[in-house]
């Protein structure tokens, strides 16, 4: 396989399970509609990187074709590395004949479902509805676009069903967080860019330092700090600001604050999703789930502080993610007071870590509610960063 590329730290990139699924679906559709066997498929990822992926386990019938793409994680220590992701594409006369009430219509003509080794959602709060296959929205879009491309090529206007499967999925899923998330029976099909960009912890923290150092050396004294793509998208699409003055910190909030102090930055504004940044209210400065997962404890305590009864607190403690917990707070009309007290604790811990030499602020958001809370100096910091005076 041709090397995909390397990160700035020299580590080999890989590709996601979403890319595997989209590539396998595209190849199966190509063979089904052309009647000819192919051994390699081209896929353009959302990141803009072209992949040329080898096909395995090809099985062709008159009305359906299946094939597999092997997952490659590069230098990322990913438990899904090396597994085969299968796609079966089948012609169907009418979508009403599809035998699964939990399948998903990607378009008027294309239906998607998961088979063996693809996890099923059993609890609310995830991207998919209960009962549906754990195939996230970006991979769904990738699969739809890939199959539609083939349909246009062969001027096919009939209905197709795509079924994904991962024979090793149930076993591999035991090594992931899926059981804790309420996803049973297999792995999730994931990915936001289609590409796996691995980083060792040291390489990642070194990169954070270098990114901030470059800003500083180019005359920037104030910057945004976001964990990753969600924060970056929020900057662009919701706050409508220039992301040139931003640094991705991943899970390393504490290290990033120390870097800012060491480099002599005047101030930083942290902007993050509640799923990560709620942990800051407990003083947790490395937000990776391996380090600590106090999300429900924080929300439960602050709900109790604002009048929630024991039953509500226990309900929050049983949630699998912050989206589900926020629905409970919304029902109890507690979002505003809880976010107010949460923000006070976040500010306390951030200011304690930053000290007097670094001005620090924070904006907390969710996909559903937008801005949930912000520090008193957040608007002022936004202005300073955009002006960089």
Model regions and ranges:
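Polar/charged alpha-helical tracts
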Residues: 152-153, 233, 237, 327, ...
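A structural signal for small-residue-enriched, beta-sheet-centric alpha/beta enzyme cores
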Residues: 2-5, 12-18, 181-187, 192-342, ...
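Extended hydrophobic packing segments that form well-structured cores
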Residues: 109, 140, 343-389
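Flexible, glycine-rich phosphate/dinucleotide-binding loops
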Residues: 171, 232, 371
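Generic N-terminal targeting/processing segments that precede catalytic cores or assembly contacts
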Residues: 1-175, 179-181
């Amino acid at each position: 396989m041709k090397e995909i590329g390397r990160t700035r730290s020299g580590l080999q990139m890989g590709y996601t399970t979403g890319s595997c699924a989209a590539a396998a679906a595209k190849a199966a559709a190509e063979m089904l509609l052309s009647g000819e066997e192919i051994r390699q498929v081209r896929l353009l990822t959302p990141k803009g990187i072209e992949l040329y992926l080898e096909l395995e386990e090809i099985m062709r019938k008159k009305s359906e074709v299946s094939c597999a793409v092997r997952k490659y994680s590069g230098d990322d220590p990913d438990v899904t590395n090396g597994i085969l992701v299968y796609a079966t594409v089948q012609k169907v006369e009418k979508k009403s004949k599809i035998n699964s009430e939990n399948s998903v219509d990607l378009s008027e003509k294309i239906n998607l479902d998961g088979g063996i080794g693809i996890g099923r959602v059993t609890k609310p709060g995830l991207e998919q509805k209960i009962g549906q296959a754990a195939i996230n929205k970006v991979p769904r879009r990738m699969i739809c676009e890939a199959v539609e491309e083939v349909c246009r090529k062969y001027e096919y206007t009939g209905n197709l069903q795509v079924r994904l499967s991962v024979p090793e999925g149930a076993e591999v899923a035991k090594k992931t967080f899926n059981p804790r998330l309420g996803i049973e029976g297999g792995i999730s099909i994931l990915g936001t860019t289609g590409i796996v960009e691995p980083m060792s912890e040291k390489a990642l923290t070194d990169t954070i330092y270098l990114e901030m150092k470059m800003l500083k050396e180019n005359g920037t004294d104030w910057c945004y700090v976001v964990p990753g793509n969600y924060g970056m998208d929020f900057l662009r699409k919701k706050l409508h600001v220039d992301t040139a003055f931003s640094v991705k910190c991943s899970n390393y909030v504490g290290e990033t604050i120390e870097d800012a102090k060491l480099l002599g930055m005047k101030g930083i504004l942290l902007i993050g999703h509640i799923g990560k940044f709620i942990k800051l209210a407990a003083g947790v400065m490395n937000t990776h789930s391996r380090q600590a997962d106090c999300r429900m404890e924080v929300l439960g305590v602050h709900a109790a502080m604002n009048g929630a009864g024991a039953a509500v607190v226990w309900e929050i403690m049983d949630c699998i993610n912050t989206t589900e917990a926020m629905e409970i707070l919304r029902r109890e009309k507690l979002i505003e007071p809880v976010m107010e007290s949460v923000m006070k604790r976040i500010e306390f811990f951030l200011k304690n870590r930053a000290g007097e030499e670094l001005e620090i602020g924070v904006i907390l958001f969710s996909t559903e509610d937008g801005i949930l809370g912000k520090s008193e100096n957040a608007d002022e910091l936004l202005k300073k960063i955009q002006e960089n005076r």
